[in-house]
């Protein structure tokens, strides 16, 4: 491995033993350098890294190598390569703590700030993924932003964009905003965004780009042309597309930006930031393939679903005469995409809830240049009005529970509070099991604790799994819970209320400051604690008012949020002139 001459004398016997193990495991003498490297890598993956003692020796050898590093450019570059390679290998093989040690040792050895930051980005991202907030996170974020500013000042928008995106990756990491802690953006946008706003590169991408948009062509005598575009996620669009395709006088096309040919127009996050910086420096415009350009030229209205990649991408397109309407749900508000969108290229933005709108308005300066609307998602709520099954009044329901944001542990707290008074109550968790893949350390720890609690409740907690027939499943549920830490609208809550289940809604803590569920639903539905949730249920059941309260909630939600009520408002935005 080229490290033996850097190993301290006290460790050399063990290092030689490890070297012999490598040679024995490698077998035949390699016939080429490439074959030799491949053989050594197999031994590392199969014999060295999985073994605790050998892995510890490997780490100590690298740390010794890093401590004895010289300041020569060649030696510094070697340290960087070795740290990146070894750190990624350890991460891939399931040893993130060891990878953090490697990156930390490499950072201490490197003299050149930009080279050291290559390891810093890997180390801090890995710590965040493990569910830990690095003690030096904000200092390193400032380093990345300062480097982005220097490259931008030198006219290197590509490198500036790379460094700026790395800063966004850290500042908006899911551990900070979507896992087991309050999002610092939602808690205090000004304080959270202050380091970004101090950066010239970030201020550049937030600045609206002056432009003259061409006059829209007349649609007289032909159908209104609606182009619907997104990046991969069509979850909330299926019914809407069907409805508009069936509407006389409307012609619909769709465009998934993930499916367009690869090229300089890619909608990858780092490319979007680079393109945005080039745009602010009067660089060449973002020009898509001819067939994509034709679709935008064809359209009278472009409906961009999700305020994420597609939003930033479409906002930079030149010469768009169509009306550009974007819809923002909840997730996107906690990403950097709305911040580096060129809002000069957008006409209208639709928010699915007032509290998400309030948060984005506080965080994103450019949004104030755009007409803003609040229109909830499509829901055919009349289909949920079905008779309840016997015993449903003692069944609590939670629709969708397989992530930390839904916080199903809070539902267990409610059940526990109810059982202190009446052990007939059960909790039914509808939907897929708690996710095991692509989770952070915090999410994995949450799941482990949750599953232990569920097992302890025995038959009082039911997990029937995913169902395609939610209206039928709701017949057996008499109380619909919303236990989330953050929501946009919570479709399952609206559907449950429409079915005649009593709605009991936690005051979603991550967005409570911005209005929370009370910005969408009656205040009487909202509670602060599990004990208050249990008290609402027991009080209405004990007084004989459970049935009437549930009926009133069903009537209210259907008259407010059924698609028959909501669609005319969306029609006005999508089908009107620019």
Outline where the language-model segments fall:
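Conserved donor-binding/catalytic core segment of Leloir-type glycosyltransferases
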Residues: 389-406, 412-419, 428
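A short, active-site helix/loop in glycosyltransferases that binds the activated sugar's phosphate group
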Residues: 336, 345-371, 379-381
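A charged, aromatic-enriched C-terminal amphipathic alpha-helix characteristic of glycosyltransferases
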Residues: 78, 382-385, 405, 541-575
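Nucleotide-activated donor-binding/catalytic signature segment of Leloir-type glycosyltransferases, i.e.
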Residues: 441-466
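Acidic anion/phosphate-binding donor-loop and adjacent secondary structure
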Residues: 214-215, 334-338, 361, 376-394, ...
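Aromatic "clamp/platform" in nucleotide-sugar-dependent glycosyltransferases that forms part
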Residues: 485
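Short hydrophobic beta-strand element within catalytic cores of glycosyltransferases
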Residues: 502-506, 512
């Amino acid at each position: 491995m080229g490290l033996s001459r850097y190993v301290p004398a006290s460790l050399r016997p063990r290092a030689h033993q490890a070297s012999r193990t490598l040679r024995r495991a490698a077998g035949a003498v390699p016939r080429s350098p490439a074959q030799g490297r491949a053989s050594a890598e197999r031994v590392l993956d199969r014999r060295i890294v999985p073994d605790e003692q050998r892995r510890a020796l490997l780490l100590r050898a690298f740390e010794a190598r890093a401590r004895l590093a010289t300041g020569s450019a060649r030696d510094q570059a070697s340290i960087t390569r070795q740290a990146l390679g070894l750190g990624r290998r350890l991460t891939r093989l399931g040893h993130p703590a060891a990878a953090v040690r490697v990156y930390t040792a490499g950072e201490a050895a490197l003299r050149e700030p930009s080279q050291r930051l290559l390891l810093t980005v890997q180390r801090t991202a890995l710590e965040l993924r493990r569910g830990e907030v690095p003690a030096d996170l904000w200092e390193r974020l400032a380093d990345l932003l300062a480097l982005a500013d220097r490259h931008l000042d030198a006219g290197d928008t590509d490198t500036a964009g790379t460094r700026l995106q790395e800063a966004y990756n850290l500042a908006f990491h899911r551990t900070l905003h979507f896992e087991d802690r309050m999002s610092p953006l939602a808690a205090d946008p000004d304080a959270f965004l202050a380091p970004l706003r101090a950066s010239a590169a970030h201020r550049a991408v937030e600045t609206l780009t002056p432009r003259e948009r061409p006059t829209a062509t007349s649609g007289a005598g032909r159908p209104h042309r609606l182009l619907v575009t997104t990046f991969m996620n069509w979850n909330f669009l299926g019914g809407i597309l069907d409805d508009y395709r069936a509407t006389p006088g409307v012609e619909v096309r769709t465009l998934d930006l993930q499916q367009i040919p690869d090229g300089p127009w890619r909608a990858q996050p780092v490319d979007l930031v680079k393109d945005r910086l080039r745009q602010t420096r009067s660089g060449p415009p973002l020009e898509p393939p001819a067939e994509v350009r034709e679709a935008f030229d064809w359209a009278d209205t472009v409906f961009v679903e999700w305020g994420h990649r597609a939003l930033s991408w479409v906002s930079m397109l030149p010469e768009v005469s169509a009306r550009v309407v974007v819809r923002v749900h909840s997730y996107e508000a906690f990403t950097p995409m709305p911040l580096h969108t060129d809002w000069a290229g957008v006409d209208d933005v639709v928010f699915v809830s007032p509290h998400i709108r309030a948060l984005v308005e506080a965080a994103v300066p450019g949004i104030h240049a755009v007409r803003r609307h609040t229109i909830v998602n499509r829901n055919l709520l009349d289909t949920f009005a079905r008779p309840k099954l016997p015993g449903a009044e003692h069944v609590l329901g939670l629709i969708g529970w397989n992530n930390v944001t839904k916080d199903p542990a809070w539902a267990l707290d409610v059940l526990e509070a109810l059982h202190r008074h009446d052990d007939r109550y059960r909790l039914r968790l509808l939907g897929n099991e708690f996710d095991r893949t692509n989770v952070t350390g915090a999410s994995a720890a949450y799941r482990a604790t949750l599953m232990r609690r569920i097992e302890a409740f025995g038959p009082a907690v039911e997990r029937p799994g995913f169902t395609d027939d939610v209206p039928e499943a709701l017949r057996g549920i008499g109380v619909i819970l919303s236990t989330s830490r953050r929501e946009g609208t919570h479709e399952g809550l609206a559907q449950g209320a429409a079915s005649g289940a009593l709605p009991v809604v936690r005051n979603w803590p991550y967005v409570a400051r911005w209005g929370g569920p009370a910005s969408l639903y009656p205040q009487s539905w909202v509670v602060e604690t599990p004990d208050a949730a249990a008290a609402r249920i027991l009080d209405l059941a004990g007084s004989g008012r459970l049935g009437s309260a549930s009926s009133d909630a069903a009537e209210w939600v259907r008259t407010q949020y059924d698609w028959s009520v909501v669609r005319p408002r969306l029609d006005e935005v999508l089908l009107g002139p620019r």
